[in-house]
A protein has these predicted regions:
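Short acidic/polar hinge/loop motifs at secondary-structure boundaries
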Residues: 130, 139, 168-199, 215-218, ...
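Short strand-turn segments of transmembrane beta-barrel domains in outer membranes
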Residues: 202, 212-249, 260-272, 776
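Acidic/polar loop-and-plug regions of large Gram-negative outer-membrane beta-barrel proteins
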Residues: 286, 294-351, 375-443, 501-514, ...
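Surface-exposed extracellular loop regions of Gram-negative outer-membrane beta-barrel proteins
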Residues: 305, 311-316, 513, 556-567, ...
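Outer-membrane beta-barrel signature, preferentially recognizing the C-terminal barrel domain
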Residues: 323-347, 351, 514-518, 522-528, ...
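Signature of Gram-negative outer-membrane beta-barrel scaffolds
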Residues: 441, 467-594, 727
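Gram-negative outer-membrane beta-barrel transporters
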Residues: 656-658, 681-790, 900-904
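C-terminal beta-signal and adjacent terminal beta-strands/loops
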Residues: 659, 711, 779-801, 809, ...
Length: 905
């Protein structure tokens, strides 16, 4: 019986295989008429996929009948074609031409210019860089139109997206996020990107909760020729020059690409004092040994230095306006910023690729080294020199007991005339010191990291309708972390000494006098090994597709202190090896009702190790680990309806996600009662065991009203809330061992993940004479500030002076003080337009984008301060409506523009 069953199954498979027709075709560039490599060719019913090779060729196996073929490639307009498959065993289709999508290219350029460096910890880590290449209408709106208000799809963090360059993971050990600035200014060479949205499948990685971005850097994929471009802007930088040459695939099997760019803003752009000084260089060479074997070497280097902007209190905004930046001051006619971010981390990737039919093998070796620095003014035994320090603001005198309104008015006038950092005073103070000791210096917090990565990825069909993909990644990461004396500001030396605790920062050294370039304050190393293995199976049926995938993740981390800081007895030497392991799974099902109507369902379980910053009590000064470290766990599911009509494309998605065991670490000074004996101090705070729920809807649609007119719309309706009361763990110089402090009452508060609602409608006109213009109107709402955990513990109602509960508590007033602030809704109008010409063999394109056309002033995010984290102090601080320690806000850009001219030879 079993033999007969096996025979009939084999016969059925043979009949099915026999009835298939081998369909071959080519895809070319509509303008250059040259073949396009990497074009995705897809049939929805039955489910079939192919990708064009270096000669633009593709092959599909299809039965007889009429089918709808979809052609898509990043940077080109997605097209579709109805084909009729005859009875022949082999059928050749006419060449199919794709036209460049200049609107998408312009949007990508504008997005990159505005956001490629907005990755500071204090900001919302806009995910636009992760979304810019998407063909999806909703994702493109999220990247271009919503990103200026720090919108995040589904409220996910950028650490939830896996970013890879030629198979090498780019997410960092410290915080789990990719550093997009490492390839900033190299748009031409990194534009070939493949995205998996959310928990959908990927051919190269298991992916994160928010998906994956795979950047393909292969010279054979780039358009051959020489391309020059120049940009003017008033956003992050004022000018940019770029040149890229791609040889294309030559007869000897070689292809290479060279690219370089320069971006600059001497004294800032939209915000004064935000220096921007960046270069970028890249080289890639590819050798195709034959039709199956390929070698590829890539080098990327994008050094940059840029000035930061400060989050502002409402008082500072009211006095100085939305473009105020206290970090800079005049120094001999230049606007010098005290807080700069300096990045210099080259990347090298060597790859071997094998492909024969549907079998693919990728072996990649990656090495990245260099450093990231963040400068700041440090001072020993002196007062904070920042012009907006709370004691220099009018509110300081208003909020005293008794209030001094006359002094507040005098201080207001003084502040208005002295609102910027006074470099001359700092130099004078240091030079006038009797022994030459600097009271003020510019310090640089340095992270010097070296990462070696090996990646192996293998994909092959195991049966006619079953495809297997597996991958293995090993990373060895070594990082040195320390503070560096960057500038003595006219003095002769700086003491490596903690005047607050009356202790040296390193008692192992005899000479505590530090010169420029010396380490001070803290110094430690982190050594880590990361192993990640994943496997994925895809099952393709006539009208359906199913995938299942699993990932195993191993991470170990060990801290080694180089300084002995007496306040922390375990600051020096090697600490314990912390090992974290986790297994994650996901699955998806896609069903084609017809070739134009699809239903898709995905579900996943993630078990992910905590980032390094969330496992130590105080990583700068101590080897001590937090107790009961648990992996972050997430459960998620989504359902999608996808519509692809000739004149209407749409996606509707519903999703729900629960995230558990999340941790958040912050450092600040507080006047809250920490213990029975300690009423204030500089605190390292970790909120542990946070549980969040994210659910909502996403909808994006695009309608071709006329051959030249397109209407688009996008809607995001989300709700992101805390669903438990996690634990608070704190340590300070007075509590170096750390203590489990209290429960934080966060339940039902909103997670501060950017706007939770977004609406967009747009029109695009595309002339047959190769010019186009588009406009979008966007509304972003339900954006909440980050919460102070200390404000929401039982200690909030404890008087730090008496250690007893405050008397005469007005609980209605307390609820008002603790109400989470919802920022004002934001309405923005954006315009993008362009024109292209072809003069003989020269192609010219011009683009202009204007964001926030009506110059709307808005706040893009904010956070509560924890300085006055008790009822009495907060009540006093808010008594006159101008709190000294009120919420701090990140200010959005006003009207900005970018103009770009590109010439391709």
């Amino acid at each position: 019986m079993l033999k007969k069953l096996f025979f009939y199954v084999l016969l059925l498979c043979s009949i099915t295989a026999f009835s298939q027709v081998k369909v071959e075709g080519t895809v070319i560039d509509e303008i250059t008429k040259k073949p396009l490599q990497g074009v995705k060719v897809r049939v929805n019913s039955p489910r079939r996929y192919a990708e064009t090779d270096s000669k633009g060729r593709y092959v599909l196996q299809l039965p007889q009948g009429d089918f709808l073929l979809f052609f898509s490639l990043n940077g080109y307009t997605t097209r579709e074609e109805v084909v009729m498959i005859e009875k022949e065993r082999r059928q050749l289709l006419d060449p199919y031409a794709l036209s460049p999508d200049y609107a998408q290219e312009a949007e990508q350029l504008a997005v990159i210019s505005e956001n490629e460096l907005e990755d500071d910890e204090s900001q919302a880590d806009a995910m636009s860089g992760l979304l810019q290449s998407s063909q999806d209408v909703f994702m493109r709106r999220a990247a271009f139109d919503f990103s200026s208000v720090f919108f995040k799809p589904r409220g996910y963090d950028s650490k939830d997206v896996s970013v890879l360059i030629n198979g090498i993971p780019m997410n960092r050990l410290e915080n789990g996020r990719a550093q997009w600035a490492n390839w900033g200014g190299l748009n031409d060479i990194t534009r070939n990107q493949e995205l998996s949205n959310g928990i959908a499948k990927s051919d190269y990685t298991f992916g994160g909760l928010a998906g994956s971005t795979y950047i393909h850097i292969r010279p054979s994929l780039n358009r051959p020729g020489l391309r020059f471009s120049s940009s003017l802007s008033n956003r992050s930088y004022v000018g940019r020059l770029m040149a890229t040459y791609s040889s294309g695939l030559q007869r000897n099997g070689l292809a290479y690409t060279l690219s370089a760019s320069r971006r600059w803003a001497a004294n800032g752009s939209w915000v004064d004092g935000t220096l921007y000084n960046a270069y970028a260089f890249s080289g890639a060479i590819e050798y195709q040994l034959n039709n199956y074997h390929n070698f590829n070497l890539v080098g990327l280097f994008s050094p940059i230095k840029r000035g930061k902007t400060s989050p502002l209190t409402r008082e500072a905004i009211d006095l100085m306006g939305y473009r105020y930046n206290p970090y800079w001051g005049d120094q001999q006619g230049d606007k010098r910023n005290s807080r700069n971010r300096i990045i210099s981390e080259p990347i090298f990737v060597l790859s071997y690729n094998y492909q024969k039919d549907d079998t693919r093998l990728n072996v990649d070796l990656g090495y990245q080294f260099g450093e990231i620095g963040n400068t700041r003014i440090s001072y020993g035994n002196a007062q904070n020199p920042e012009p907006n320090y709370y004691k220099k603001m009018p509110s300081y005198y208003l909020n005293q007991q008794p209030s001094d309104e006359a002094m507040a008015e005098l201080q207001k006038n003084y502040f208005l005339n002295n609102s910027q950092l006074n470099w001359a005073d700092l130099y004078a103070a240091n030079r006038n010191a009797t022994d030459g000791r600097s009271a003020f210096i510019v310090s640089n917090d340095v992270n010097r990291e070296r990462t070696f990565t090996t990646n192996v990825n293998f994909s092959t069909p195991v049966y006619e309708n079953i495809k297997s993909t597996s991958g293995l990644v090993y990373r060895r990461i070594t990082s040195d972390n320390y503070a560096l004396v960057d500038d003595l500001l006219g003095g002769n030396y700086f003491m490596n000494y903690d005047y607050f605790e009356s202790q040296p920062y390193n008692s192992l050294e005899a000479d505590r006098k530090k010169q420029q370039g010396d380490k001070w304050n803290y110094s430690y190393a982190l050594n880590s090994n990361v192993v990640e293995a994943f496997s994925q199976l895809e099952f393709t049926f006539k009208k359906a597709e199913v995938f299942v995938a699993a990932r195993y993740h191993y991470t170990d981390v060990q801290r080694e202190g180089n300084f002995y800081y007496p306040v922390y007895p375990d600051s020096y030497g090697k600490g314990a090896l912390q090992v974290q392991k986790g297994m994650s799974t996901k699955a998806g099902f896609t069903y084609a009702l017809t070739g134009r109507h699809l239903l898709q369902f995905n579900t996943a379980y993630f078990n992910t190790p905590q980032s390094v910053r969330n496992i130590f009590v105080n990583v700068r000064n101590s080897n001590r680990l937090l107790p009961n470290i648990k992996n972050e766990v997430a459960y998620t599911a989504d359902a999608n309806y996808i519509l692809r009509l000739p004149y209407l494309k749409s996606r509707l998605t519903g999703y729900i996600t629960e995230i558990e065991n999340t941790s958040e670490t912050n450092f600040f000074y507080t006047e809250t009662a920490l213990t029975d004996e300690i009423s204030n101090g500089f605190v390292a705070q970790t909120i542990d065991g946070i549980k969040k729920r994210h659910f909502g809807l996403e909808w994006g649609a695009e309608a071709q009203l006329l051959p030249t007119l397109k209407l688009s719309a996008a809607v995001a309706l989300g709700q992101y809330t805390y669903v438990n009361n996690p634990k608070l763990y704190i340590s300070s110089d007075d509590i170096p061992q750390g203590i489990a402090y209290d429960e934080v009452k966060l339940k039902n508060y909103h997670v501060p993940s950017g706007p939770q609602q977004a609406y967009s409608v747009g029109l695009e006109y595309r002339s047959n004479n190769y010019w186009w213009v588009s406009a979008t109107a966007n509304l972003l709402a339900k954006n909440y500030v980050s919460l102070s955990a200390l404000n929401r513990t039982s200690q909030f109602f404890i008087d730090p002076n008496t250690r007893q509960s405050f008397t005469n508590i007005d609980y209605d007033k307390a609820r008002q003080l603790l109400k989470q602030e919802r920022l004002d809704d934001v309405f923005l109008v954006n315009l993008v337009g362009g024109k292209s010409w072809r003069v003989k063999k020269v192609y010219i394109s011009a683009m202009l984008s204007i964001n926030n056309l009506f110059d709307t002033q808005f706040l893009s995010g904010g956070f509560e301060q924890s300085r006055t984290a008790n009822y009495g102090k907060m009540l006093q601080d808010n008594a006159h409506g101008v709190p000294s320690f009120g919420n701090r806000y990140f200010v959005g850009y006003g009207r900005t523009y970018m103009a770009n001219l590109a010439i391709s030879l």
